[in-house]
Amino acid sequence: MSHSYDYDAIVIGSGPGGEGAAMGLVKQGARVAVIERYHNVGGGCTHWGTIPSKALRHAVSRIIEFNQNPLYSDHSRLLRSSFADILNHADTVINQQTRMRQGFYERNHCEILQGDAHFVDEHTLALKCHDGSVETITAEKFVIACGSRPYHPDDVDFSHPRVYDSDSILSLHHEPRHVLIYGAGVIGCEYASIFRGMEVKVDLINTRDRLLAFLDQEMSDSLSYHFWNSGVVIRHNEEYERIEACDDGVIMHLKSGKKLKADCLLYANGRTGNTDSLALENIGLTTDSRGQLKVNSMYQTALPHIYAVGDVIGYPSLASAAYDQGRIAAQALVKGEATAHLIEDIPTGIYTIPEISSVGKTEQQLTSMKVPYEVGRAQFKHLARAQIVGMSVGTLKILFHRETKEILGIHCFGERAAEIIHIGQAIMEQKGGGNTIEYFVNTTFNYPTMAEAYRVAALNGLNRLF
């Protein structure tokens, strides 16, 4: 690469996508700087998104597990924790993650520049530092990995102390008894689980006709039933007319004529790419209405020397995929092409209580494609390990081709679903006939384990063939 620039490459953002790109670049010998606008590395994933919300979920799920365990049923009072106490656990995890990720950059001699950056021209950035000074830095190539933030419609007053988004909810300073959650996507459903697990009343407003429509319908229905059974009130096909924030709560007026009141509102309906501060107009790049950039298969934007990865390019908007996108972009940036690519079937993990995870095709997709598939199921309540740990709610479903026995999709609802799914994913990725449901019948599993669900489901499915 040319040495007429300050750096071979500058990465804007230190979340999963930026980290993946930066590590991939320095490992190939590039001179790299990473720009981070906040005081600590890690991006939204570490500080406001994946890590804190999953730490919250874990703490709440352990409280639920204790309170429902028959071993402790003789205790006269239930175990409870305040939201502030649980947030302390999340803060501990965030600090550990931040220190670890800071170490990655230090060990690999990757320079971190703190401040807000915007493009001056196609090879120059202006960096406004925290002390107010402005520096000009240049690079031959760039990776935009600045992530996303919660979408804020203009008619919702997010400055009001009773109105939160998925970032600011982590600064909740009071103990709500009733929460309105607008938006029943992944974030909305995860926080509905968290609040309901803390015995908070939850109204979940869904703008669509069912929860998480991208899931296999049985998984979506299982979540809906579990929410209903735990007391979450779900209102489908609703949109707000206006939101009225008061001193003691929030009133939501729906277009259907309904009115809802709660102690606070969590608005969780969509996200926006953090591109508005980059002055992309100075280099001729444009974004869509949600601030997202279009890229090709090597993550190049319309300007070939500028790449973009992670939430800022939209789907799949997963931390796991963003890291891989960063590594692929780094390879393309240095070598001019990328031999690596994202796998076709990216697993999804939804950290509700219980978890949901899936990989591959759904029943609805296979039916519309007219694929002759069969279904194998295992109920967690029949597994010795689930009975031992008292987590009998859940199911594993394997979809496979009736004729070739090839696994086409795996769907799991229950505790540890996001871990369990990877066993099946590993077999699905096998080539040369290695992807077969018969693997689970012919292998030996540790006993007792949750992994045994694969053998149970495989036998159940194969027994349906004739």
From Swiss-Prot:
Signal peptide: none
Cofactor requirement: FAD
GO CC annotations, alphabetized: cytosol
Keyword NADP: yes
The record's free-text note on cofactor binding: Binds 1 FAD per subunit.
Keywords: Cytoplasm, FAD, Flavoprotein, NAD, NADP, Oxidoreductase
UniProt KW RNA-binding keyword: no
GO molecular-function terms, A-Z: dihydrolipoyl dehydrogenase (NADH) activity; flavin adenine dinucleotide binding; NAD(P)+ transhydrogenase (Si-specific) activity
Name of this chain's protein: Soluble pyridine nucleotide transhydrogenase
Biological source species: Enterobacter sp. (strain 638)
